[in-house]
Amino acid sequence: MVKKKVALLATAAVAALLVGTTAPVAQAALKPDFKAVVGDECLRIGKKAVGRGVNGTDLTCTKVTTGSFAGTLRWWYPEVKPFGSVEWVSSSNIGGGYGTTAIAIGDAMKKEGLLKDYTVTYRSNAPLGLGYFYDQKDRKDLLLITGFAMPGGLATNGSKLSITTAKAVAGVMREAEAFVVPTSSKYKTINDLLADIKANPKSVAIGGGNYGGVDHVTVATLAATVGVKATDLNYIPYSGGGSLVPDVIGGRVAVGISGTSEFASYVAAGKMRALAITSPKPLKVIKGKTLVQQGVDLTFGNWRGILAPADLSDADLLNTQKIMDILHSSPSWKDTLVAKSWIDEFRVGTSFQSWIKKENADIISVLTDFKLVK
């Protein structure tokens, strides 16, 4: 049952990984207005694409004045108001996946004229990050990066907070996980590691993100393939990949697990080796064989998205959702996805709101089955 639930959680990631890491291609032809999405080319200024925007709003054929599409006619939200500045909240230390995502989104927004400037506020875990976020009032300029790890991080810390209290903006991407070891490690394949975990699970120190997060669930699912329970593992939680890196390089943990983008530069520099990647196929961003290539039938990916304050007005929420819809269509964001080997898994508005409620419940269910939460 646990394996089935985990597989269901990862299904979207697997499908997207198969198609999501190739470079974007130029549009071959104009779409009719009833098939248009924001950013598509159009012909007549002022023409409407009825119901084709966020939450069933209209798109308008507009001559764009900012960003990569400046000077061209595009299906657009002419009423959208770009941000002045944004404070991103990251529930990880500097170098962690949430902060990395905030920086990537902020930089792409600036390139597209959707944002003038941004800052990132770091808190070391899910309760602290979400707690800080919820304590702020009347903030139109505040957004939080969430993801798979947050529901588990809240539950395993005994927090009463929930991501479903906030207003859902958009889900933006998924990222494959990487198992990494020091360059001098005795482990050459994932099966070498699994052999030691099976023989004596407590003897293998495994570093990853917070208890109950995607790293922990991925490790638990992998261990289950050799009959080891999640509660028997020697799992050491860190507040993001940034704080884990020195302990992997220094050999203070036998293996580390986090998103591929957090380890890629260190693998490329020869400071650590990627023992296995959780994508169905090898990735350009990091050198290493997949679990599937090594005979382990497991794929997984960590989604990340954006939440807005619970007291944000409906009008300001819709404007934020439209900004994210525009960003998703932009060359700057597509380049970011390719550069980081992130998977283009996008949901915005009410579709993300309904999805995240179900995802939150599914994650807690999986963690309960693994006996990581009660």
Residue ranges and their predicted role:
Residues A28-E79:
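Tryptophan-rich substrate-binding surfaces of secreted polymer-degrading and adhesive proteins
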Residues E262-S330, K358-A361, V366:
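C-terminal lobe and pocket-closing loops
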